A protein has these predicted regions:
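Single conserved hydrophobic/aromatic residue that forms the stacking wall/gate
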Residues: 1-9
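Short, basic/aromatic-enriched C-terminal tail that caps enzymatic domains
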Residues: 143-159
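Structured catalytic core of nucleotide-sugar glycosyltransferases
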Residues: 11-13
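Conserved beta-strand hairpin/beta-sheet module of binuclear metal-dependent hydrolase folds
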Residues: 22-39, 57
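Cap/insert and terminal regions of metallo-dependent hydrolase folds
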Residues: 46-147
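A short acidic, often aromatic-flanked loop/helix-cap motif at beta-alpha or helix-coil junctions
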Residues: 6, 19-20, 151-156
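Active-site metal-binding loops of divalent metal-dependent hydrolases
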Residues: 16-19, 39-41, 62-64, 115
Length: 159
């Protein structure tokens, strides 16, 4: 991936581990602000984290709950693909990533996105991430955490 500049904004794509052709996430920044979008992530890598560091706002995949995935109606091969290293990011891993960024970066807003309809629920994704934040001694009052709607546009966020 290569970067591109538009006016004062720079868009920097970064590679992600997913079973698709050239998948990528994006970091968008200017001199004052940075945001990142990262979905369809099979597993979190140091390279992805480096791209996310410095972001004030992050839209991060929180695709599935491990226990719900085990019990959902998906066939075994699809469950294995989703939970595999080139599949999707679990709620727990999303929470661990947000915890790290909250402690080591400028993150103040995180939106959980790309939730599965079959193996996740918005309330469960949210609570799992909050539980991870608390387990990692993060101040939950220092982050604006929300879950993106599957069907509707989100609210306007001003940086």
């Amino acid at each position: 991936p290569s970067s591109a500049a538009s006016d004062v904004y720079k868009r920097q794509p970064f590679s992600i581990p997913h079973d698709a052709a050239n998948p990528c996430g994006f970091t968008i920044n200017n001199e004052k602000h940075q945001l990142s979008i990262a979905t369809d992530i099979g597993h979190m890598t140091n390279d992805i984290v480096k791209h996310l560091e410095g972001s004030e706002l992050l839209l991060l995949e929180s695709n599935y709950d491990t226990e719900v995935l085990k019990c959902c109606k998906y066939p075994f091969h699809l469950k294995a693909r989703i939970a595999g290293s080139t599949g999707h990011l679990s709620n727990t891993m999303s929470g661990k990533t947000i915890s790290y960024l909250l402690k080591n970066s400028n993150l103040n807003t995180a939106i959980l996105g790309h939730l599965s309809k079959e193996s996740n629920f918005p309330e469960l994704a949210y609570q799992t991430v909050v539980d991870e934040l608390l387990a990692n001694n993060c101040n939950t009052d220092s982050i604006n955490l929300s879950v993106a709607s599957r069907e509707l546009p989100g609210r306007l966020i001003k940086l």
